[in-house]
């Protein structure tokens, strides 16, 4: 059995970190599942989220709810990329940062990596967060 590419795929990250690549797609249910997976990991937990696209009028509310879910799950750090992810970051509060520039996000994230860190990257395919994954894997 082989997992589908970029769907909860565990990879070796830089500085001995672990990366869970779930960058292929995103919707509210899949995001909740990803949060649950990350919450069960050992060590410092970092979640990188991109926008959930195609939610229409529900977009703002769904992204705010996600921020609360991530915080309540005990995730240590949240990094957001995309217009709606700004709302997710705002709901999470302390230890969350929003980026408009993907390269700045990659630079900041890379500086946080160590052997005690697990990073989960999740967003709609259109956000191209696979670029973040490719930059932080060993």
Regions found by a protein language model. Name each.
Residues 1-138:
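ATP-dependent carboxylate-amine ligase
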């Amino acid at each position: 059995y082989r997992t589908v590419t970029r769907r909860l795929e565990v990879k070796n990250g830089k500085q001995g970190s672990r990366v869970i690549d779930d960058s292929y797609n995103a919707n509210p249910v899949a995001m909740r599942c990803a949060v649950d997976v990350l919450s069960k990991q050992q060590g410092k937990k970092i979640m990188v989220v991109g926008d959930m696209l195609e939610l229409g009028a529900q977009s703002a509310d769904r992204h705010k709810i996600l921020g609360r879910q991530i915080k309540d799950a005990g995730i240590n750090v949240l990094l957001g990329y995309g217009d709606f992810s700004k709302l997710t970051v705002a709901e999470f509060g302390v230890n969350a940062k929003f980026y408009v520039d993907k390269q700045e996000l990659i630079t900041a994230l890379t500086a946080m990596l160590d052997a005690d860190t697990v990073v989960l990257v999740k967003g709609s395919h259109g956000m191209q967060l696979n670029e973040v994954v490719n930059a932080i894997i060993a």
